[in-house]
């Protein structure tokens, strides 16, 4: 606050209640944006400090018209005018936000830094691009008005957005993995039971209040195995190649990273946006091993006593494999970052044998029927 021009003595940042005044001021100008658990009177984490510093770049600076002290005999009178925003009449006006003729912190101290609204990221989410002079630092998605990671009813979106009127389906735009696709879930109205999204798919919802339109952005999670992990060279960064055969999903490809090893099972996202068409993110899939007791046609499996619903992109593969699993053997289920099943690794091989001899009455205590088997590896078993 001091760096933005706020005077601690004038604003009451002293005395027993200084923290209350500081917190109130910080919240009032948006320094806590992005932290729903802001306290203000406790030590901050590294991530929180970075967030507050970023928000300060966008904050408007302030100043005071006058601060005079008048002494008449034994009486001291302090006169202070009201606080006002610092004006900006330089060519940096508009580098941060609109041309509002107000001085944002970054406009004063980082004149080569600029933000550009109205862009979109690899998945077509409304985004802001930051540049240093002409060099692009990065494009970052704006905060969504609602977010889901499972299939959701349209009526629930209506309620979560706090809408008072419905939105026609013609005013809803749907992108899936960066590709514009047809929205077919009907008008966004109260109580609608039609659904969008999917289990294990990130669905970001953006509401344009001025235009009364919705943009839905679905980012699917796929699964693959690391087929090769290449070290960095003088001409290329380290990267991995994905194997998406077998029961894996998605288009696969390569991804620049040195975080994974050959045969790791990973989850990843992929963009089909023109100019992108590549893997956008990747993470090591969590795994759980145990006996699979049940499965459903929707692809959910119960392993080691816990039920895991299937990721929408993996449901069919998991169901088809689950029908062939030997229930007496352990399986390993791999999960996405939301806890949905992506892939099940199980021994589904079939052992063949020739019956050499069969006795209906073995002559033991229980008169058990027995057979002598010859397996393909030459071993025999009774």
Residue spans for each PLM region:
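...the same signal can extend to comparable exposed beta-sheet modules
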Residues: 11-15, 24, 35-39, 46-50, ...
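Glycine-rich, acidic and aromatic/proline-enriched surface loops and short helix-turn segments
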Residues: 1-6, 22-28, 55
């Amino acid at each position: 606050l001091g760096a933005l021009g706020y005077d601690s003595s004038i604003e009451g940042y002293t005395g027993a209640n200084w923290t209350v005044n500081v917190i109130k001021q910080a919240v009032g100008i948006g320094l806590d944006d992005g932290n729903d658990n802001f306290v203000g009177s406790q030590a901050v984490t590294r991530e929180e400090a970075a967030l507050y510093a970023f928000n300060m770049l966008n904050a408007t600076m302030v100043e005071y018209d006058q601060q005079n002290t008048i002494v008449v005999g034994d009486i001291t009178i302090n006169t202070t005018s009201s606080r006002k925003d610092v004006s900006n009449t330089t060519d940096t006006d508009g580098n941060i936000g609109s041309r509002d003729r107000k001085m944002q912190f970054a406009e004063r101290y980082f004149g080569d830094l600029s933000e550009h609204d109205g862009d979109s990221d690899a998945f077509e989410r409304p985004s802001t691009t930051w540049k240093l002079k002409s060099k692009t630092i990065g494009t970052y998605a704006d905060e969504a008005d609602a977010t889901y990671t499972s299939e959701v009813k349209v009526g629930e979106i209506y309620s979560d957005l706090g809408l008072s009127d419905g939105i026609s389906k013609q005013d809803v735009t749907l992108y899936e993995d960066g590709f514009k696709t047809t929205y077919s879930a009907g008008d966004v109205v109260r109580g609608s039971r039609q659904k969008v999204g999917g289990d294990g798919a990130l669905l970001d919802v953006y509401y344009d209040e001025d235009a009364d339109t919705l943009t839905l952005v679905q980012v699917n999670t796929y699964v693959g195995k690391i087929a090769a992990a290449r070290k960095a060279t003088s001409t290329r960064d380290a990267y991995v190649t994905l194997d998406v055969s077998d029961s894996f999903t998605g288009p696969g490809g390569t991804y620049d990273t040195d975080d994974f090893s050959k045969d790791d099972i990973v989850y990843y996202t992929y963009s089909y946006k023109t100019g992108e068409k590549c893997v956008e993110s990747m993470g090591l899939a969590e795994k759980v091993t145990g006996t699979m007791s049940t499965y459903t046609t929707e692809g959910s499996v119960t392993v080691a006593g816990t039920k895991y619903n299937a990721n929408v992109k993996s449901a069919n593969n998991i169901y088809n494999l689950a029908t062939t699993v030997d229930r007496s053997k352990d399986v390993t289920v791999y999960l996405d970052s939301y806890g949905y099943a992506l892939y099940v690794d199980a021994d589904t091989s079939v052992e063949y044998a020739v019956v050499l001899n069969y006795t209906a009455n073995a002559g033991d205590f229980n008169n058990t029927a027995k057979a002598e088997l010859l397996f393909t590896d030459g071993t025999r078993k009774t």
